[in-house]
Amino acid sequence: MLACLLSFQSADSLAQGNLTPPGAPSPTMHTLDQIYDRGDPRIRITNSSSTVTISIPGSYFLTQDLTVSSGNAINITTNGVTLDLGGHTITSTAASAVGAGVLLNSGLKNVVIRNGNIVGGVTNNAVGVYSGTGFAYGIYYSSTAPVNVCVSKVSVIGCLYYGIDLNAGDATLVEDCFVRTVGSYGILASTVKNCTAVECGYTSISGDQVSDCRGETTFGSYGLFGVNVQNSYGSSASSGYGLYAYVALNCAGTSASSYGLYAYYSAQNCQGQSTSGTGLFSRNVNNCYGSSSSDTGIECSGTAINSSGVASSGLGLDAYCAENCYGNGVSGLSASTALNCLGVGSNGDGVYAGLTAMNCFGSTGAGTGLVAFIASFCHGTATTGTDLSVTHNINSY
């Protein structure tokens, strides 16, 4: 019976099916390389339109621009994070400036943020009012200041309040960064290196150690503020100090109506200029230049050496002790003790030495060429005034 049944099956029914293999399988989800770069162990951030929260320690990088509609763009909530923005730009479309481009949780440690841009829509109306869209802060922290945090090669533009604020706490560093058009502080950290902050509503750059920086404030307190400042420039377009430091080396500062450069303890190889305030002030001045249109060129409460002060309608140089100095103004140079100095006055005294003048020369138009209690080997001359006024004269004329 079985043989009979088999005999009725056709040849086609006994033939094999199509032996040609199908094509390669089509991908139905992300490849491994899209999630993880075998040559780069960092974690990719692929989000482009909503807030990113980093809550696990590690190294992260942004793969594209990120735009949020409100609040913070990136929240870092854990220690030990390195965030590379990959040269991309973080923006916000919030109608009123709110949130931060990157916000650090309170008291975070060991965080690095680098290589990117944070852009808001805040502008300055040229009379000190900042308003607009986007972010309130560029990079900021909540509550307790961070420790051992570095921000490098980041630009922040158009934020309502702070640009990059890490506080002047322990081991915070901002380097190679740029900030423009923010309503309060531009950059604030314990160390600031090779940075520029301009058009800031308050202090443009502030740090304990500041070097190779430029800070310009429109209406604020200081163009640049630091404890030890080197190779830097600060400017205030209004009533703020151009540059303020405890120790300033190779620096310059300008101000419209306050101190151009103010160095509490010492200024060396520095320049200060002010329209209606003092050009340069310090307790100790060495190899400096200060100028003012209507106040004092250089004011020194200690010793000024190898320095020059010029004032169009004020006192050129005023020091407790002046050595190898030059002053030019309505009154040229004033000191308790003057050594090897030159002073030129238009209507006031050329050189005024409250105690002793030695090897000095003073000239004036209508005032007194040289005034001293004791003058040794000095000379004074006046066009229409008095050449010399000396109580004890030693070889002076």
Predicted regions and their residues:
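Bacterial N-terminal signal peptides
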Residues: 1-9
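Acidic Gly/Asp/Thr-rich repetitive segments characteristic of extracellular carbohydrate-active
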Residues: 20-61, 71-75
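N-terminal non-globular leader segments, chiefly Sec-dependent signal peptides
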Residues: 22, 28-31, 103, 110-111, ...
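All-beta strand scaffolds that present successive hydrophobic residues in beta-strands
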Residues: 60-62, 82-85, 108-115, 148-152, ...
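Extracellular beta-strand/beta-solenoid scaffold signature
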Residues: 68-73, 95-104, 126-143, 158-167, ...
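Ankyrin-repeat and related helical/solenoid repeat scaffolds used for protein-protein interactions
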Residues: 340, 344, 348-385
